[in-house]
Amino acid sequence: MIRPLIIALDVENRQNMQELLKTLPKPLFVKVGMELFYSEGPAVIEQLKDEGHQVFLDLKLHDIPNTVKRAMRQLATLGVDIVNVHVAGGVNMMAAAREGLEAGTVDGRNRPKLIGVTQLTSTNEAMLQKELLIQSNMNGAVSHYARLAKEAGLDGVVSSAQEVPIIHEHCGPSFLTVTPGIRLKEDDKGDQTRIVTPEEARTLGSWAIVVGRSITAAPDPAAAYEIIRKQWEG
C-alpha cells in the first residue's frame, strides 16, 4: 500500500509556492492550507492539479450543517483529493459535508476523501481540560471524536501519530489516519506539542504524514524531503 507523504505548502502566495516546488521532485502530494488558498483562491488548486500533483485542501470547515454541505459541494468541483472538517462540528455537520462532496463530485472523478480533525497537534492535555473543558485524557478525547467521524461516514481523521493505535482499535485498521506534527529529531518543535518522527509515525500505523517546516524551512528542501521519505517508507 502506498502511504502518502504530504508536503504542507504553508507559504504566502503562488510565487513562493512555485519557488519551493522548483526544488522538489515531481509529482507530489501537497497540502494547501488557509493562507495560500485565501491568498490565491481556486486557481492555485487548478494549477497544482494541472501539474500532476495530488492535493489535500486543508480548510477545516466548521459551521452549521447546511453551510458546510453547500461549501463542500463547491470544493468538490475543484478536483482535490482530500478535504477536512472539524469533528467538533458534530455528526450531522460531518454527514452533511459528505453529502455535499457527493453532490459536487464531477462524473468520472472519485469523491475527495473526507477526514475529520480530532485535536490539533498544538493542543496538550492541560489545554484540552482547562480551556476546552473536555474532561478526558487526549487518547480518550481523540478516540471518541474518531468514532463520531466514522459514524458520520468520514473516511478517516487527522490526529497525532501517538493516538493512531487507539483510533485503529476503535475504528478498524482501514480507517484513515493523517498525521501532522512530523519533525526530524534535530528539528525545532515550533508550536507543536504532540510530535513524532517519520519513522515513529510509520511504526505507529499512520496512513499519511503531513510535513511542513522540516522540508520547507530546510536549507536544502530536496535533501530534507529525501531523508523524510526514506524514514517514512522504511
UniProtKB/Swiss-Prot annotation:
Which reaction does this enzyme catalyse, per its entry?
A: orotidine 5'-phosphate + H(+) = UMP + CO2
For whether the record's keyword set contains Iron, the answer is: no
Claim: Ligase is one of the keywords in the record? no
| Catalytic site positions | 60 (proton donor)
Q: Which GO terms describe its cellular component?
A: cytosol
Report which superkingdom the organism of origin falls in. Bacteria
User: What keywords are annotated for this sequence in UniProt?
Assistant: Decarboxylase, Lyase, Pyrimidine biosynthesis
Residues engaged in binding substrate = 10, 31, 58-67, 121, 183, 192, 212-213
Cite the InterPro entries for this sequence. Aldolase_TIM (IPR013785), OMPdecase (IPR014732), OMPdecase_AS (IPR018089), OMPdecase_bac (IPR047596), OMPdeCOase_dom (IPR001754), RibuloseP-bd_barrel (IPR011060)
Where in this chain does the entry annotate a coiled-coil region?
none
One GO biological process this protein is involved in is:
'de novo' UMP biosynthetic process
The GO terms this record gives for MF are: orotidine-5'-phosphate decarboxylase activity
Q: What is its EC number?
A: 4.1.1.23
* CDD domains xref list: OMP_decarboxylase_like (cd04725)
Q: Which pathway, metabolic or otherwise, does it act in?
A: Pyrimidine metabolism; UMP biosynthesis via de novo pathway; UMP from orotate: step 2/2
Q: Which family does it belong to?
A: Belongs to the OMP decarboxylase family. Type 1 subfamily.
Q: What does this protein do?
A: Catalyzes the decarboxylation of orotidine 5'-monophosphate (OMP) to uridine 5'-monophosphate (UMP).
Q: NCBIfam families under this entry?
A: PRK00230.1 (NF001273), pyrF (TIGR01740)
Its quaternary structure? Homodimer.
Q: What is this protein called?
A: Orotidine 5'-phosphate decarboxylase
Q: Which organism is it from?
A: Halalkalibacterium halodurans (strain ATCC BAA-125 / DSM 18197 / FERM 7344 / JCM 9153 / C-125)
